[in-house]
A protein has these predicted regions:
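Active-/binding-site microenvironments in catalytic and ligand-binding cores
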Residues: 1-223
Length: 223
């Protein structure tokens, strides 16, 4: 998604972008298109039962916007705090010598491979379906449009290789994926986008994710 940094003319904004076509109280957006019939259509496509992990591993050097961090810590019981200490050893607590490991994460949740809730972006002070920020933001989250309000996603997926259709291994910084780009990339596949489909775009930037440290963290996080 491109975020336009230039001033937006008032006439560029459709005045009736809310209420949603799915209803004034809707919090799921286009996921409403994943009907039971759509799920059945999707599962009938399965032939080999292969499972592909689309997520990147979270670690402290992952590409991120400035100010966002991910840290993971492991702590053990007090006998094992410092394994190089002269008193460190395998002895635990009690007659069965119990030891343990505790994991602690300190992170900005808007990082890595994830699915945004519809409360993430706003136009001015209004979110999806026209909800006002002042009405939904509370001390510990939002009372509407959180990721918990979205249904589970089981549907047909389409991978659109826009990097290849642009003639390269990855898009250039600043490239915007347009409808025409998507149509061009789809033309050679014989597929079209149907209501309820999950559309994934291959931009090529994921190939730089594992650089340690990332060569261009800002652009990798952006694209």
């Amino acid at each position: 998604m491109a975020i336009e940094t230039q001033p937006m003319a008032t006439q560029d904004v459709t005045a009736d972008w809310w209420p949603s076509r799915y209803g004034a109280e809707d919090q799921a957006g286009a996921l409403n298109e994943i009907t039971p019939g759509k799920v059945l259509e999707a599962v009938r496509l399965v032939r080999q039962g292969r499972v592909y992990d689309l997520a990147h591993v979270l670690h402290q050097d992952i590409p991120a916007f400035p100010g966002r961090t991910f840290r993971q810590y492991l702590t053990t019981n007090y006998h094992q705090i410092n394994r190089r200490h002269p008193d460190a050893g395998p002895e635990g607590l009690g007659s069965n010598s119990v030891n343990w490991i505790v994991e602690q994460l300190t992170a900005t949740q808007q990082m890595g491979t994830h699915m945004d809730g519809l409360n993430h972006l706003q136009m001015g002070d209004r979110t999806y379906n026209g909800f006002l920020l002042a009405d939904i933001v509370e001390d510990y989250g939002t009372c509407r449009l959180g990721i918990d309000t979205l249904p589970q996603v089981v549907t047909r997926g389409l991978l659109i290789d826009v990097a290849a259709s642009h003639g390269g291994e990855r898009l250039e910084p600043g490239d915007v994926i347009t409808v025409a780009d998507a149509e061009k990339a789809l033309a050679s596949t014989g597929h079209d986008v149907r209501p309820g489909d999950a559309v994934l775009f291959h931009t090529g930037w994921g190939s730089l994710w594992s650089c340690k440290p990332p060569a261009d963290s800002w652009n990798i996080a952006t694209y």
